[in-house]
């Protein structure tokens, strides 16, 4: 394979998007960007990024942020374990590295929530360290470039492609090279039908030459996701909406939600379950069915809307006033059909 860096970087200089992520290329800004973009499209992430950076401009601010306030900043992005790990990492950065992310790939890689790709992106773009940053975009570009049928989700394939990315890397400009590959995959070498006629690497691309770029990369068939019934109780009192805190570990850890049970309950069973926490509810209206898809399971939601007299609640439950629901309690998108994030 001939060198790809020169035409790639020339294309990147002329075509890269003017994004707020690129206006402040500090290690901290890059880290926040990359964590947000792991499960979120660029256009959707921009307002969250700007709000997050305005509220928490450096690792020290992130480390000190109260957990519910942090989750409220993240509300709408989902996958809350990302921001929980960011706070853990920020505290380590403050304790061990003087409040600045370390200019070392292995040290970055050791921080909670930072994998090979994120460590490579921060190390190369912020610090000019010649290490690859291989995400799904880059895997797709190289599968087509080399006309490679290997399963890109297999660890051995990722390792082999990482070697190829490193072999092509200009050691003087690793950051722009990595960003250019990601940008090419996002704008031109897209999933499904790539825009090969616009690609600066078309003359070098073996997949394009073979007429099969749109058939690559090869991925295994997705596994079927298990379906889990969730019964929701949307209960209002004069003090507000009944909320329940989820467990500190596991799915949606530490977030607030309407009282809910991960099983199918009848109206009478739901009334009894609420009575078990001291809430004497009148269930008046069935909730419309809803669905929320996680990476490994599907919640099938339903339940009842009702009212109850305000009462003392056990630990882990609150009556949330409307203004507190908007400002204090982060409710995950899984319940968005019933509780709208403000």
Regions of interest found by a model, annotated:
Residues 2-197, 201-210, 214, 280:
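Catalytic cores of DNA base-excision repair glycosylases
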Residues 1-18, 23, 186-342:
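Intrinsically disordered, low-complexity, charged terminal extensions of DNA damage-control enzymes
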